[in-house]
Regions:
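Glycine-rich phosphate/pyrophosphate-binding beta-alpha loops
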Residues: 71, 149, 208, 277-290
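Active-site nucleotide/adenylate-binding loops and adjacent lid/helix of ATP-dependent enzymes
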Residues: 2-16, 44, 100-188
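Short beta-strand-to-turn element immediately C-terminal to the catalytic PLP-Schiff-base lysine
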Residues: 124, 152-158, 194-196, 263, ...
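ATP-binding N-terminal substructure of ATP-dependent carboxylate-amine bond-forming enzymes
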Residues: 1-96, 100-102, 106-109, 113, ...
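Phosphate-binding site of ATP-dependent enzymes
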Residues: 160-241, 267-272
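Conserved metal-phosphate-binding beta-hairpin within the catalytic cores
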Residues: 183, 247-282, 292
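Short, flexible, mixed-charge acidic loops at enzyme active sites
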Residues: 79-84, 211-219, 278
């Protein structure tokens, strides 16, 4: 699909926006993608995703759909299934890979048995947090099926959530019924883009304050991107190999971005894959375009 976009003049529908927690990021991604496609000669129709999107696509009959959606329903297999039923070609991963990768626990169940190192942990009900910690502190709470670090919190002994977490505590996880609780891994935040079957590079993400949350990802100046990351050669190679192996094992296509934590004190054994993103951001601050340059 990437080669087709590069070598042919097409009518491309860019799906963006929608109603997920990542709507604004998707609109920014979509606008940038549409502008880039027009620069290389394609005819582009921008579509802000709504529940009439199938009718709109049938009206314009594009040659291909560029999926610039993030979160539900554009990243979880729903839109992919619709496009399959309509017989429309589209970018990025298909229904099955998208449905698996959006579910962090299901992804772990598939990749960990293949020897891809991932953190332990388990799914908990958010209401149960008030009865006691699901893991020894520090630990990470994250929604099972959200991206862009939406709803992520690090719970430490020094956190202001209380011990156990108080019912009055205001945490970013509160809008979600189910959460994935994982041990906190000290060290570096890394990411690897895979594009058309090739791992591109390893970037270290260095937040200027706090951790690499939603604001740090999408606010200029809050995160330093070091590409290539300053790592031992064997860690760089391992991260790229793990990202490509995960991409292939899940059946992904086009572009993905795999996120890691790396604890230098543990050496190579301290490298953990956190998740695979099948709809990576394409904003001016996003990592896949940066690594692809």
């Amino acid at each position: 699909m990437t080669a087709q976009l590069a070598n042919s003049k097409l009518h491309v529908a860019v799906l963006m926006g929608g109603w997920s927690n990542e709507r604004e990021v998707s609109l920014t991604s979509g606008a940038g993608i549409a502008a880039a496609l027009r620069r290389i000669g394609h005819t582009v129709t921008e579509i802000d995703m709504d529940r009439d999107v199938a009718l709109r696509l049938r009206e314009i009959a594009p040659d291909v759909v560029f999926n610039a959606l993030h979160g539900t329903p554009g990243e979880d297999g729903t839109v992919q299934g619709m496009l399959d039923l309509m017989g429309l070609k589209y970018t990025h991963s298909g229904l099955t890979a998208s449905a698996i990768a959006i579910d962090k626990q299901l992804t772990k169940a598939i990749l960990a048995p293949l020897g891809i190192r991932m953190p332990g942990g388990h799914v908990v009900k958010s209401a149960s947090l008030h009865d006691g910690d699901p893991l020894p502190r520090p630990y990470v709470l994250k929604p099972v099926n959200e991206g862009s670090s939406v709803g992520v919190a690090i719970v430490t002994d020094a956190s202001n959530y209380g011990n156990p977490i108080a019912r009055s505590a205001e945490g970013p996880w509160q809008q979600f019924d189910e959460l994935l609780a994982e041990p906190f891994i000290a060290g570096k935040e890394l990411t690897v883009a895979v594009l058309d079957g090739e791992a591109l590079a390893v970037t270290e993400l260095i937040p200027t304050q706090g951790f690499y949350d939603y604001d740090a990802k999408y606010t200029d100046g809050l995160t330093v991107h070091q590409c290539p990351a300053d790592l031992p050669a064997d860690v760089t190679r391992a991260a790229m190999d793990m990202a490509l192996a995960a991409h292939n094992a899940l059946g992904c296509k086009g572009a993905t971005r795999s996120d890691f934590r790396y604890d230098p004190a543990q050496g190579l054994a301290g490298l953990y894959l956190l998740e695979v993103n099948t709809q990576p951001g394409m904003t001016p601050l996003s990592l896949v375009p940066e690594q692809a340059k």
